[in-house]
Amino acid sequence: MASVGVAAGRQAEDTLPPPAEPPLPEMKPLPQPQPPPSVSAQQPQPAPKPPSPAGVKAEENCSFLPLVHSIIKCMDKDSPDIHQDLNTLKAKFQEMRKVVSTMPGIHLSPEQQQQQLQRLREQVRTKNELLQKYKSLCMFEIPKE
């Protein structure tokens, strides 16, 4: 009895029009991996640098949520510490305004930023094309004596 309902449901699915989704873009196959160069030709790679303390500090200082939470808790308890927390939040806002004003490109209009982004994307695309072109060139090995 259950198989009849399943079959009827499948027939209904078959009669539905296909969804109006755009076709997926055609994906290019990845290039074949190159064998690693010989150990003697390999140059020592510098170790990756750990994130700078200033960068880590900046990420930690950007969160306003703990201060806002503390202010709300003080308001619920009618605590006298609320003025201190509000002043801390105000100082943090001023500090973040200074950080934002020193960011590169902040002086540009949104249109100029979009133009710069398009130029940079075009440069990346061109460089990737050149890289693929150079990778596909026939490489000749120097005979060993």
Curated annotation (Swiss-Prot):
Q: Report the coiled-coil segments.
A: 111-138
Q: Does the keyword Mitochondrion apply?
A: no
Entry-linked PANTHER family: MEDIATOR OF RNA POLYMERASE II TRANSCRIPTION SUBUNIT 9, MEDIATOR OF RNA POLYMERASE II TRANSCRIPTION, SUBUNIT 9
Modified positions (Phosphoserine) in chain numbering: S109
Which Pfam families does the annotation name?
Med9
Quote the subcellular location field of this record: Nucleus
Q: Which organism is it from?
A: Bos taurus (Bovine)
> What keywords were assigned to this record?
Acetylation, Activator, Coiled coil, Nucleus, Phosphoprotein, Transcription, Transcription regulation
Task: For the region Disordered, give the residue spans.
Answer: 1-58
- Matches recorded under InterPro entries: Med7/Med21-like (IPR037212), Med9 (IPR011425), MED9_metazoa (IPR039242)
The protein's name: Mediator of RNA polymerase II transcription subunit 9
One Gene Ontology term, aspect cellular component: mediator complex
Q: Name one GO biological process term.
A: regulation of transcription by RNA polymerase II
According to the UniProt entry, which residue ranges have a biased composition of type Pro residues? Answer: 16-38
- Taxonomically, the superkingdom here is Eukaryota
